Design a protein with these regions (language model features):
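Bacterial N-terminal signal peptides that target proteins for export
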Residues: 1-10
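A composition/secondary-structure signal for short, hydrophobic, low-basic-content segments
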Residues: 3, 17-19, 30, 213
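Bacterial N-terminal signal peptides
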Residues: 9-19
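Lipid deacylating catalytic domains
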Residues: 24-233
């Protein structure tokens, strides 16, 4: 995992951007973060949409994080953090604007929130888009500290009221924050209940807008690529 010296500042991070992106439009670099046990390819539709709009490969970052065979082992602390941290720092360093946009799906939403707040990067993020995230917790994980036998539902996990979730609540993530959600999301709306504390769990504190679609958990990612691209331009 990279350790970024805070005194160094981020003003010089895009020194090589012009050389790297000479053939591309000057737009924010984009970081796309998949969900628990997912793959970077989960964002293929988004990637294709961005490419069609003129983004270069060097402007799109798709880190791969976490165990692919043990979803219950993944949380928001430790080895899961490194790939996302590296992608954020590398994206800022290579962005011709000095800023980035980020899009997360499912647990990728909360993992992005963790890294942005932990590293103090919110000032470098223009747009944060959270798709089908459990920003307020998953009822399938129960209420902390109960039903926390797995890492995914533990202290650093997604049980409702977990110390981790309480720690990111209300923290600034970007200049503009949006959520994309569904009332038929089979993961976030476990047992038919989507709300936590009277608010849809995918809604993010301070969001500029929230967009609702009649898709399932993965359909929200796969079938909203144009909406995602619109939000970051």
């Amino acid at each position: 995992m990279k350790v970024w010296p805070r005194h160094f500042g981020y003003a010089v991070l895009f020194v090589f951007a012009c050389a790297v992106q000479a053939q591309a439009a000057c737009v924010d670099s984009v970081v796309l973060v998949h969900g628990n046990a997912g793959q970077p390819s989960d964002f293929d539709a988004t990637y294709a949409e961005l490419k069609a709009r003129g983004y270069a490969d060097a402007q799109i970052f798709r880190p791969s994080w976490g165990s692919k065979i043990c979803p219950a082992c993944n949380d928001h602390s430790g080895s899961e953090e490194g790939p996302v941290e590296d992608a954020l720092i590398d994206a800022i360093a290579s962005s011709c604007t000095g800023h980035i946009d980020v899009i997360g799906h499912s647990m990728g939403v909360t993992l992005l929130a963790r890294e942005i707040t932990r590293l103090g990067l919110s000032g470098y993020v223009d747009t944060f888009v959270g798709i089908a995230g459990a920003y307020r917790g998953l009822w399938s994980c129960g209420t902390y500290p109960f039903n926390v036998a797995t890492s995914t539902c533990g202290y650093w996990g997604l049980s409702v009221g977990s110390p981790f979730l309480n720690g990111i609540r209300g923290k600034p993530l970007a200049a503009r924050t949006y959520s994309i959600k569904s009332w038929i999301d089979e993961i976030v709306c476990f047992g038919g209940v989507c709300m936590v504390g009277g608010v849809h769990s995918s809604s993010i504190d301070g969001e500029a807008a929230s967009y609702t679609y009649a898709y399932g958990h993965f359909g929200l990612l796969w079938y909203t690529a144009a909406q995602q691209a619109d939000l970051i331009r």
